[in-house]
Amino acid sequence: MSEYKDTLNLPETGFPMRGDLAKREPEMLKRWYQEDLYGEIRKAKKGKKSFVLHDGPPYANGDIHIGHALNKILKDIIIKSKTLSGFDAPYVPGWDCHGLPIELMVEKKVGKPGQKVTAAEFREKCREYAAGQVEGQKESFKRLGIMGEWDKPYRTMDFTTEANIIRALGQIADNGHLLKGFKPVHWCTDCGSALAEAEVEYKNKVSPSIDVRFKAADEAALLAKFSLNEGHQGQGDVSIVIWTTTPWTLPANRAVCLRDDLEYVLIQVEGDNPERIIVAAELAKDVMDRAGIEHFHNLGFAKGADLELTQFQHPFYDFTVPAILGDHVTTDSGTGVVHTAPGHGQEDFAVGQKYNLEVANPVGSNGVYLPDTELFAGQHVFKANDAVVETLKEKGALLHHHAYEHSYPHCWRHKTPIIFRATPQWFVSMDQAGLRAKALESIKGVQWMPEWGQSRIEGMIEGRPEWCISRQRTWGVPIALFVHKETAELHPNTSELIEKVAQVVEQKGIQAWWDIDAAELLGDDAAQYEKVLDTLDVWFDSGVTHYAVVDKREEFNGAEADMYLEGSDQHRGWFQSSLISSIAMKGKAPYKQVLTHGFVVDGHGRKMSKSIGNVVAPKDVTNKLGADILRLWVASTDYTGEVAVSDEILKRSADAYRRIRNTARFFLANLNGFNPETDIVPVEEMVALDRWAVGRALAAQNEIVKAYDEYNTHAVTQRLMHFCSIEMGSFYLDVIKDRQYTAKLGGHAQRSCQTALYYIVEALVRWMAPIMSFTADEIWNQMPASLPSGESRDKFVFTGEWFDGLFGLAEGEELNNAFWSEMQKVRGAVNKLLEAARSDKTIGGSLQAELTLFADDALAAKINKLEDELRFVLLTSAATVKPLSEKSDAAQATDIEGLFVAVRATEAEKCDRCWHHTPDVGTIEGHEKICGRCVSNVDGEGEARKFA
């Protein structure tokens, strides 16, 4: 064999079998940034049609987690695939830099503003902290292979962005959507500030469930409203009963609310202490059961509408409250009568406005009752629940009391229960200028992926309250408004003043607002106006980046955002704040497509939790397996639902990666000695199987590009794996090894094969690039340096487009896709028999076998098209086809109807060069150890191959 070794075209490549990604990827990253890969992409795509994926900014606090990695990798895959599809797709990553979590971290270091440090110094410390967090997260994202404007990201704390956020506020005010109101808002007593809807999370809490009597102020007047049975009025006090799980709100009660069309029943409670109570008729039995009242009967009925404005005595204060009517009253639970405290609930507030009720707010920002709160002054509201219950008992107002577990709003940061509290706040009004209706209409023009996203956000917009955009915090963009000290009206020149403030902030940052003297801007008006000292909700900051970033950054060339891509929780967060602000400013949605992914869970479907010990950190994965494995995991998942990750799942991704890598390595190793400029074989002269392989690559490319266009990365990886493992690995690459290794060096048979391999790897490397970016770059650098045109290969795969050199089989080609599909089935059937022959020691390897195929006429006609090259497809030393009628006793049935196969061990000698067993080995003078085919490939013109 050694004497013929140099006549073989053995595979050779600098592309290693082992990826060793954890070690190699950082080296590749270094080169990408040294050679300005992102800049090269931008230059290559300048002037192309644009695709803008606007980055939802992660919060600048803490290390990135696996959810961040999922999100950023998905975005990067889409950006890179769009680039390969010929789009100019810049990526400007962003960060959310203001707000409470950063304040809390800084407070731990320097204390609260106004204690050891001034507010100005505190803001500067917050800015420094956020900047450090951004840098840490940035390096983590870069390590994942994500390309973008990392040297010029957007940060909501950049002076220019802060100024543009203020300008956005001005536009919303100009368009009539801003209002100031004294309204109940979500309030965290630990934060001491209002919370946005998106800052509230719901979890179970045990609360006191109480049924409370409100006695009738005028029994006779009340009874007159009921249709009484036979005129019997009954005996005992008359009370209407409310149900609540927030006893602490009773000091602020100003009404009891009924529904106009509900029927209410007057019940006589029998026994030693008779009394009469009023509840909704359909809930009467539930109330009686709950209160343990067994003996009672109905006295009469009245509609809710008939009881409107009837007066009832507050259970522990010396005033009466009216019965009012509201659509929010239901019979799902409770008594059908709702305790109404306009200062502590949005529905209560809304119905209270109709009846001009007092908006009582006896609770301070720290959750403690104010000093003038009768009976409960100085107590924290949640601790006061017990005190309220005791007071109700003392007053004889408590009908029933038990512990009740229910879903309750909590602060997303502190994980503590929150309250509704009426305070003066700034709102973006959903209805005063038709914002809600316009938003709902605009939703219809957006493509929501998955489709259920549309109904989800529609429901949220339909039901959401006014957007409270003010916060009582230090580190945030100021609500840069001047209001009249007496009327609280905005200054008439608000538009001009906002622009002046924005120009100063653009130069000096948000601190300029607190430093600026009102007289500098207002002149003589300064004495009548005061600065608003509240800051903006951070959801406003990120929500207006469609204006502050997309409209303003030169990278986007004035284009609007095509896509927003975030987790499904952002229907109530960024998608919504962006939509509302964009409608308020521009009258249209800020995006054309909204794509969402699910949350990351472990292999058992559980949330990531340090206490469970199931957290998968991106850094750990890249340090152990490499970023391309993490990227392949992301791409392989159906990300529209929950996305599972675990060591076992990542191991499966690593196995899939190895199969793809080994396929690519085979291609590269067998392009050894191939020069596309001089060695390409014309299509019509290629071996039939090679043409088929290129055609399969074209079919795969069409499906893969379509899947990329539809953001279906799961389908991309499935098709890629099928192509590498089944179409190539299990068939084509297996068949061509003999020809590639043993055919005449540089001869037609070998060059035809290499031409196919070259075309396919040119396509394959591009399919891989958006997902396995590091590996694609590694492959690219091992590919032939020159192109068929004689031009040099681009420095990076990412600057090009999908390969356009593939071709399908010609129309009317005899050995078409159906033919090769049938041959693969024949080969599969034969392989099972060869495997059995190996197991029973009839043969060693398949080249020691000679086959006789007994086939029916139709199948025989197809198989015979391969002529003498059938043996190369079946990987045996000899294969003949005979009619089924001549089937021998040795023939065995196969999975294919009309096909029997006889396997026997060959008696022919083995060729030292190709390892085939043929009768002519030892018969050729001077080449006694090799077969005639090999002699031709070594000394002659080389074997001719037409089919395989």
Curated annotation (Swiss-Prot):
Pfam families: Anticodon_1, tRNA-synt_1, zf-FPG_IleRS. Its cofactor is Zn(2+). ATP binds at residue 610. A motif ('KMSKS' region) lies at residues 607-611. One of its GO terms (cellular component) is cytosol. L-isoleucyl-5'-AMP binds at residue 566. Its EC number is 6.1.1.5. It catalyses: tRNA(Ile) + L-isoleucine + ATP = L-isoleucyl-tRNA(Ile) + AMP + diphosphate. A motif ('HIGH' region) lies at residues 58-68. GO terms for biological process: isoleucyl-tRNA aminoacylation. One of its GO terms (molecular function) is tRNA binding. Keywords: Aminoacyl-tRNA synthetase, ATP-binding, Cytoplasm, Ligase, Metal-binding, Nucleotide-binding, Protein biosynthesis, Zinc. Zn(2+) binds at residues 911, 914, 931, 934. It is found in: Cytoplasm. The keyword NAD does not apply. Binds 1 zinc ion per subunit. Monomer. IleRS has two distinct active sites: one for aminoacylation and one for editing. The misactivated valine is translocated from the active site to the editing site, which sterically excludes the correctly activated isoleucine. The single editing site contains two valyl binding pockets, one specific for each substrate (Val-AMP or Val-tRNA(Ile)). Catalyzes the attachment of isoleucine to tRNA(Ile). As IleRS can inadvertently accommodate and process structurally similar amino acids such as valine, to avoid such errors it has two additional distinct tRNA(Ile)-dependent editing activities. One activity is designated as 'pretransfer' editing and involves the hydrolysis of activated Val-AMP. The other activity is designated 'posttransfer' editing and involves deacylation of mischarged Val-tRNA(Ile). Belongs to the class-I aminoacyl-tRNA synthetase family. IleS type 1 subfamily. This is Isoleucine--tRNA ligase. It comes from Vibrio vulnificus (strain CMCP6). The gene is ileS.
